[in-house]
Design a protein with these regions (language model features):
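Hydrophobic/aromatic-rich core segments of domains that either
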Residues: 152-201
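Linear, non-domain "peripheral" regions
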Residues: 1-98
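A short, highly charged nucleic-acid-interacting micro-segment common to nuclease
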Residues: 139-153
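Generic structural signal for hydrophobic residues
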Residues: 47, 118, 156-157
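Secondary-structure boundary elements
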Residues: 83-142
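Generic recognition of cysteine residues
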Residues: 19-22, 55, 150, 161, ...
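Solvent-exposed loop/turn segments at secondary-structure junctions
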Residues: 82-83, 125-129, 148-150, 174-178
Length: 201
């Protein structure tokens, strides 16, 4: 079953998809700024957020500013990075190594076994962060520090599922915290992190 790494990208119109692609590439390359199609600030903010839901490995930028020039069809987006570029590369390498090391332990399991491996890893190694410590909303909190809020845990599950080629999205809700949704053998599984169980949806 294919991973759902572009789930939110696929929900966008063509112009928004162009902006998504440029922003994602700019963030992956750690560019100081890049030109994106001119969209409303809300659209750009939404796209920036959705990239981080599709690609939780982009944990090092959560905000941006932009400049618009008269008579231009583009805006210059300026990402705000949480760390220096050198530190981002170090953290990124550490997270990639951690994810690959964990995935190797489960790669020979069937899909349900992989899902249970991820579940057990999260339950045994990640504490819910009531104090909302630094980076607890990102994979670096869950996989690096062992503490995270629902969003950080859902992102950790997503990045592990992507590595193991399990379909998974981070479900968004205004009323409830983010949750990871996995599709295993024609059923959908919701990760309920407070109850520490997987439920069939």
């Amino acid at each position: 079953m294919a991973k759902a790494s572009n789930y939110y990208y696929d929900q966008l119109n063509k112009e928004q998809q162009r902006a998504y692609y440029v922003i994602k590439e700019g963030l992956l390359k750690l560019q100081d700024s890049f030109a994106v199609p001119m969209l409303s600030k809300k659209e750009l903010s939404d796209i920036y957020f959705l990239i981080r839901m599709d690609c939780p490995e982009i944990f090092y930028s959560v905000n941006f500013s932009y400049r618009h020039y008269a008579d231009s069809t583009m805006v210059e987006m300026i990402p705000q990075y949480l760390f220096s570029k050198e530190k981002i590369r170090e953290h990124r390498q550490a997270m990639e190594s951690r994810v690959k090391k964990l995935a190797r332990q489960a790669e020979k399991l069937d899909e349900l076994g992989k899902e249970l491996f991820i579940h057990d890893f999260i339950v045994d190694n990640v504490k819910y962060d009531k104090l909302k410590k630094e980076y607890s909303h990102e994979i670096i909190g869950a996989l690096g520090n062992g503490v995270a809020v629902c969003e950080g845990i859902a992102k950790a599950v997503k990045v592990l599922c992507d590595e193991l080629n399990i379909w998974c999205i981070i479900a968004l809700s205004e009323a409830n915290p983010e949750k990871g949704i996995l599709r295993v053998e024609y059923s959908h599984q919701q990760i309920s992190l407070h109850e520490r169980v997987f439920r069939t949806a």
